[in-house]
Amino acid sequence: MTVFPFPPDFPGLSVPFSVVGFDWDSGAPDGELLVLPRGCGAPAFDGPVFTPDAAFDDDRVLRPADAAPEHGPVWIEAFCPHGTLRSRLTAAVAAFGSRLWLHLAPMSTLYTLPCPDGAGTPVSDAERAALLAAHPSCFCPEFVCQCAHWPDSDIIRVLLYDTDETLAMQLALAAACGVPQVFGPLTTANSAAVLTD
């Protein structure tokens, strides 16, 4: 598995930047990813480009400009709205093989149940701290993240969030499931293999 550790304060998708990847097993440098937002590149650019085009299961794609859409790399998020993260990764590897790119980034989202569309509300660090002061959390093995839940009138509120430990567990699970490429704001705290030089 090749891991591309974006800096924790990476500039998102507004300016181009380059990320050196490393081999998960050996820790040796293994490839370079140029992140080039839509509209930032020359027409003849043939490197990876993030696009919001839908692929399989409403996931975004990471597609070389010179590759046909049906052969382009497929970008999926680690968040799993249905089933388990393990089943999501296993199914994605089976469907896309070497084309699969997993985006691994911390989540902090509040949901209201029932939640038929799977959409939640992003929660800031301060908001999350206030919620956790009032409601204890536990580890959720299905989603490989932390979870707090509580009743609120006739609904249930659910807070799902990541820690360095859960991100490290997600990265290890991705390797175990055969995910070929991972990218995101990984640090030495959540990935012991991330190079520091």
Feature map (PLM): residue ranges:
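Boundary/entry segment of secreted carbohydrate-active catalytic domains
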Residues: 2-39
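Hydrophobic faces of well-ordered beta-strands that scaffold small-molecule active sites
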Residues: 17-22, 32-36, 49-52, 60-63, ...
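Short, acidic/polar
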Residues: 25-28, 64-67, 162-173
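Substrate-binding surface in catalytic domains of secreted glycosidases
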Residues: 52-128
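A structural motif corresponding to the C-terminal end of an alpha-helix
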Residues: 91-100, 169-182
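Glycan-binding loop/region signatures in secreted carbohydrate-active enzymes
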Residues: 97-166
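Aromatic-rich peripheral "rim/lid" segments of glycoside hydrolase catalytic domains that contact
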Residues: 161-163, 186-197
